[in-house]
Amino acid sequence: MSTYLQSSEGKFIPATKRPDGTWRKARRVKDGYVPQEEVPLYESKGKQFVAQRQAGVPPGMCPLLAAESKKEREKQERTRAKKQEKESGRQPKAPAPGVLVMPPSTCPPPKVSQQQQQQQQQPSGSRDINSISKTLEDTLKLDAAQEVVDPAKQLKKLRKKIREIEQIESRIQAGEQKKLDKDQLDKVKKKSEILRQIKDLESTPRS
């Protein structure tokens, strides 16, 4: 767009520099003059008709009204599409032809005992400690009706129990098990009692 200079004599186009370095003189502009680059290009009726159709505006219709009508039409289409999606989501999908649909199984899953679940959940180190503890518990059970055993054999059994308790303690110190449950703690606490029994048997004179 041309820039004009205003003076007491009227409007002027300022001097401009040519590519070769020379200057064009300032030119006076008459009233009502429109520069060539600002003159709108002529478009025939047919060209205007094609341009309006490409823009989505019906021939002879105001562009603003056409834009509003287009927005309203797009809004209605979106609303209709959302409604169809909701209705299709409520209806169950039909199985493909030739596909046999089996009803959900009513058979209960196989039962797993609580002991088996605990063994599966426990790490190998914990299972080893529990196994040793179980063996120790069985050996610590004394039968009241049992006859008096040989002190040498009894001493041998008590020493075996001490070795089993020490195995549990070594596993705890090695970090294979962070803490013991109540039963395991009770078994470890019996170490002093077993040591006392061993001491008594060792001090008892043998016949």
Swiss-Prot record:
Keyword Nucleus: yes
GO molecular function, one term: exon-exon junction complex binding
Biological-process GO terms, alphabetical: exon-exon junction complex disassembly; nuclear-transcribed mRNA catabolic process, nonsense-mediated decay
One Pfam family hit: Mago-bind
A Gene Ontology term for the protein's cellular component: cytoplasm
Disruption phenotype: Viable and fertile. No visible phenotype.
Tissues with expression: Expression detected in the ovary. In the oocyte expressed in the germarium, nurse cell and follicle cell.
Disordered as annotated region, ranges: 1-28, 52-133
Stretches with biased composition (Polar residues): 123-133
Keywords assigned: Coiled coil, Cytoplasm, Nucleus
InterPro entries given in the database record: PYM1 (IPR039333), WIBG_mago-bd (IPR015362), WIBG_N_sf (IPR036348)
Subcellular location(s) of the protein: Cytoplasm; Nucleus
Residues in coiled coil: 64-91, 152-184
Biased composition (Basic and acidic residues): 68-90
Main location: cytoplasm
Family statement drawn from the similarity comment of this UniProt entry: Belongs to the pym family.
Role according to the record: Regulator of the exon junction complex (EJC), a multiprotein complex that associates immediately upstream of the exon-exon junction on mRNAs and serves as a positional landmark for the intron exon structure of genes and directs post-transcriptional processes in the cytoplasm such as mRNA export, nonsense-mediated mRNA decay (NMD) or translation. Acts as an EJC disassembly factor by disrupting mature EJC from spliced mRNAs. Required for normal localization of osk mRNA to the posterior pole of the developing oocyte.
Record note on quaternary structure: Interacts (via N-terminus) with mago and tsu/RBM8A; the interaction is direct.
Name by which UniProt lists this protein: Partner of Y14 and mago
